[in-house]
Structures are given as structure tokens and as C-alpha cells.
């Protein structure tokens, strides 16, 4: 199916996602990213006025997904949600990933600074209303940034949490209105470590300190040994996702 991305409708994107999902079930991460490049990248942009119509999202826990994507699209756009609450180690990893892998990091930020949010909402909104804090500092900036693209690539994996156990490889993202590709959804922790070792991938130093899932500093703690890797996120609260991923 050939689609002029500059005028693609939601229906066109839904059909692209459905066709991709049907033809690429069981495909490797490389094959999924190659399809993404051919469908939404520079290989699909001739005559459409569109370039870089997909973006890769990374929380900078490691550089695996960015490294994979840069192999098929050098200089690819990489989305980082700069919430204002990140660990210094995460910011350092972001800067290193951009330099080492030669990608274009786009820092998506909330309309208000942390200080402005404190003044408007009260100090430490994350502790009182974590869902609202995520909506303001993650979901809204993400939605605004994704509006400029036709597809986004994420690093969610099925083994990370029960809420992600059925994550598809390719789907239409109803929440943000574009195609969503999860090329490493089927990867195990062993697959990740093998790729990191084989390619000397950059890893956030906090991983070696016992943080298997890294988010904003105030809302991230070390999970108990053997527990859900994401159980250290918003520990003690009835919250397991920040609102970015329905699956």
C-alpha cells in the first residue's frame, strides 16, 4: 500500500498499521524498524514533502532502541520527555546517546517549569496527584510533539509488567492518532543484555545500582528483589503507568 504521507488520513494510517501487523507478526526488531523506515522514513518521502515522519521515544534507561533505529535511519529523531524531575544520570545518558549515536534528540517539555507548576498547583504535585503531574509533564508534551509525525517507535516490552504483556508489534495508537511500533516488545531481559554486551550499548548508571525501571526521580525507587521491575515506580500508590502507553 502506497500512501502520500503528507495527506494521509487516520483511515490510511489505520490500514498501514493493520497491514504491517499482519505481515510482520514474529518479525525481528531490525525487520520492524526497516519496515518503519520504508513506510514512514526518508525511503517513503520522495515527492511527498515529508521527511522523518516517525520518531523514536526513549526514556534513556539504555541506548538499545536508539542504536537499533540509528542503523536503519542515521540521525533519526529521538523523543525524550524532559519532565524537569529526572535523575542527573538520566540526563547524562541522554546527552551521551545523542553524541555517540549521532541522533537528533528532541526534548519535549511541559508548558510550565517545575517552579511555575508548584506555584499554580501546589508544591510536589507528583506526591499528591501523580496522574495529574504525569498528564501535565509527560502526556501533554508527548501529544504536542507526536502531532508532527505519522508514527512513533517505543521500547516497551511484554515482560516489563502485566499491563504490557499483550503489547502488539504494530498498531494504531488511538490516544495519539498515529501508528505505533514496538520493535522489541517480544525481547526478554536476556535478549536485552545480550544486545547490550554485543554492541557495547550505553546504559544508564542507575541500572547497575538496582533500578530496573527508571522514571522521574521523586517517583522512582528500587523494587524488592524478584518483584515486578516496574513496582519501584510510584511505589505505594495505585499507579503503574504514566499514561503514555495503553499497550
UniProtKB/Swiss-Prot annotation:
Cofactor comment text: Binds 1 [4Fe-4S] cluster per subunit.
Active site residues according to the UniProt entry: 242
Keyword Cytoplasm annotated: yes
InterPro entries assigned to the protein according to its UniProt record, in alphabetical order: APS_reductase, PAPS/APS_Rdtase, PAPS_reduct_dom, Rossmann-like_a/b/a_fold
Disulfide bond entries: none
EC number: 1.8.4.10
Gene3D superfamilies given in the database record: HUPs
Pathway the protein contributes to: Sulfur metabolism; hydrogen sulfide biosynthesis; sulfite from sulfate
Cofactor(s) named in the record: [4Fe-4S] cluster
Keyword Cell wall biogenesis/degradation included in the entry's annotation: no
Localisation per UniProt entry: Cytoplasm
Segments of this protein annotated with the region Disordered: 222-247
Alphabetical GO biological process terms: cysteine biosynthetic process; hydrogen sulfide biosynthetic process; sulfate assimilation, phosphoadenylyl sulfate reduction by phosphoadenylyl-sulfate reductase (thioredoxin)
Main location: cytoplasm
GO MF term list: 4 iron, 4 sulfur cluster binding; adenylyl-sulfate reductase (thioredoxin) activity; metal ion binding; phosphoadenylyl-sulfate reductase (thioredoxin) activity
A single GO cellular-component term on record: cytoplasm
Ligand binding ([4Fe-4S] cluster): 133-134, 216, 219
EC class name: oxidoreductase
Function: Catalyzes the formation of sulfite from adenosine 5'-phosphosulfate (APS) using thioredoxin as an electron donor.
NCBIfam families: APS_reductase, cysH, PRK02090.1
Membership in a protein family: Belongs to the PAPS reductase family. CysH subfamily.
UniProt protein name: Adenosine 5'-phosphosulfate reductase
